[in-house]
């Protein structure tokens, strides 16, 4: 397996694991209307990161690939926002989800770098090279 495929597989598994960890967090939240709203938002973001990263592997073009990565970037950042809100609203202690928040931040950084690299490569090739 070449480095690109190994990286893609690693990130696919990592984003899936992130979504599963968020699921466990969401399952532990209280059932108040406010908590349910934040839970639903967080769960949608985390699962969107995993689903769109997986879908990026089947992109039909460079633009399609980049679009899916941009969705992942936005959703992982938003997931971190909702976790921060859970802490700010005192629904979860920060120390209990610090590692999960760090993972959201790291995923955002990795995906942002991938977007930058892809744009640079598209510019060099005139955007004609398939993803």
Residue ranges and their predicted role:
Residues 1-131:
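Short, C-terminally biased terminal segments at protein or domain edges
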């Amino acid at each position: 397996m070449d480095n690109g495929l190994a990286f893609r597989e690693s990130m696919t598994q990592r984003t899936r694991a992130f979504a599963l960890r968020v699921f466990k967090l969401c399952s532990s939240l209280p059932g108040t209307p406010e908590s349910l709203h934040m839970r639903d938002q967080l769960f949608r973001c985390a699962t969107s990161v995993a689903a769109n990263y997986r879908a990026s592997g089947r992109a039909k073009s460079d633009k399609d690939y980049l679009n899916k990565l941009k969705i992942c970037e936005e959703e992982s950042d938003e997931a971190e926002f909702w976790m921060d809100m859970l802490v700010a609203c005192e629904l979860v202690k920060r120390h209990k989800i610090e590692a999960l928040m760090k993972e959201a931040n790291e995923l955002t950084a990795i995906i942002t770098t991938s977007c930058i690299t892809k744009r640079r490569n598209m510019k060099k090739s005139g955007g004609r090279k398939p993803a």
